[in-house]
Amino acid sequence: MSKTYHFIGIKGAGMSALALLLHQMGHKVQGSDVEKYYFTQRGLEQAGITILPFSEDNISPDMELIAGNAFREDNNSEVAYAMRHQLPFKRYHEFLGEFMKQFTSLGVAGAHGKTSTTGLLSHVLKHMAATSYLIGDGTGHGAADARYFVFESDEYERHFMPYHPEYSIITNIDFDHPDYFTGLDDVFNAFNDYAKQVKKALFVYGEDEELRKISSPAPIYYYGFEDTDDFVAFDITRTTNGSDFKVRHHHKLIGQFHLPAYGRHNILNATAVIANLFIAGFDMKLVAEHLKSFSGVKRRFTEKVINDTIIIDDFAHHPTEIIATLDAARQKYPNKEIIAIFQPHTFTRTIALLDDFAHALNEADSVYLAPIYGSAREIDKGDVKVEDLAAKVERPAKVISVDNVSPLLDHDNAVYVFMGAGDIQLYERSFEELLANLTKNNQ
């Protein structure tokens, strides 16, 4: 008889993906969370997984409990109940560290690009071998006969320390999560500790100065655009249909590839995947074939057209990610005005990276800013406001409210890029409704 898994905080990106994976493996899965809609719950609902309001009545002693990292005895009735009755529970990353031991595991770590790279690696590998995977966009898949397991490896609060994968990619090291990390040295130390746990091979971006200092008992392969790298992407052509490039390993051509994705960062992500699969012994012709059909991951350059208006939704919430997303938009739409609509995520990050955010947003033609989205972990002390960021942006920059997004209509032949990790999608939805109403009124 299969176990029943109960997820405390099932709508979290990693939690929902793990719930789907276990459900597909034949286990009984349920979970609880707040009632507010979150984009991950659609997949859970489609799978028929029950989502309950938080209540200690949801828990019984025969269940295996998995608790989201944000939920503690003092802020969640179910965690409090479990602790009061001495019912064991694991955190997401603790469970995952044990779970992956039954597979050949391939991790993807890094400050930026984890989700897109995990999605790409999962997509290609699942077409060549039975593969289970967890992607940070809330997507999870459990193959009953899986030999391989691909997963996103998160550095926040050093959650990746229970992981000991056979292979891992590290896309980059950058200062983020200032509510936890004390500085770049602290971030580096976390990734360096993780790298020491990789067993067979580590693949790191060679032009990242911090990653060049990483050490590991496993062989380290550098990938990138420079001849000093072990895997080099070259002969690159970026068009409105995607990116074409070749990859060589130690001066020997290993393949020619087309990726239907945009931006320099996605070429790097693909090169990391190619390097990993080459070292793992997979046929590069098959890898090239399956790269062609990659359709992306949720909330990473997700496009839609409303009333002939192009809207892009992206999770970008760090200056490096904003630059990458706007670069991708310019590649696909070189003759259109690029409009950035950005919501800063957390007061601590906004304070720490205020000048960097302003610099990144200057890559757009016009900028609109939503009020800062505070984390549940922090209190707004009034130290920073979104108007402070608007004042530093050199491009035309305005602050908008979710109730009035009409200033966005002041542009012709434009692409609207909504970016953020908070509730920026509410602003996007308001804009979509405004466009739809304009269509009705013009009929």
From Swiss-Prot:
InterPro entries: Mur-like_cat_sf, Mur_ligase_C, Mur_ligase_C_dom_sf, Mur_ligase_cen, Mur_ligase_N, MurCDEF_pg_biosynth, UDP-N-AcMur_Ala_ligase_MurC. One of its GO terms (molecular function) is UDP-N-acetylmuramate-L-alanine ligase activity. It is found in: Cytoplasm. Keywords: ATP-binding, Cell cycle, Cell division, Cell shape, Cell wall biogenesis/degradation, Cytoplasm, Ligase, Nucleotide-binding, Peptidoglycan synthesis. Pfam families: Mur_ligase (PF01225), Mur_ligase_C (PF02875), Mur_ligase_M (PF08245). GO terms for biological process: cell division; cell wall organization; peptidoglycan biosynthetic process; regulation of cell shape. The keyword Cytoplasm applies. It catalyses: UDP-N-acetyl-alpha-D-muramate + L-alanine + ATP = UDP-N-acetyl-alpha-D-muramoyl-L-alanine + ADP + phosphate + H(+). It is an enzyme of class 6 (ligase). NCBIfam families: murC. Cell wall formation. Belongs to the MurCDEF family. This is UDP-N-acetylmuramate--L-alanine ligase. It comes from Streptococcus equi subsp. zooepidemicus (strain H70). The lineage of its organism: Bacteria, Bacillati, Bacillota, Bacilli, Lactobacillales. The gene is murC.
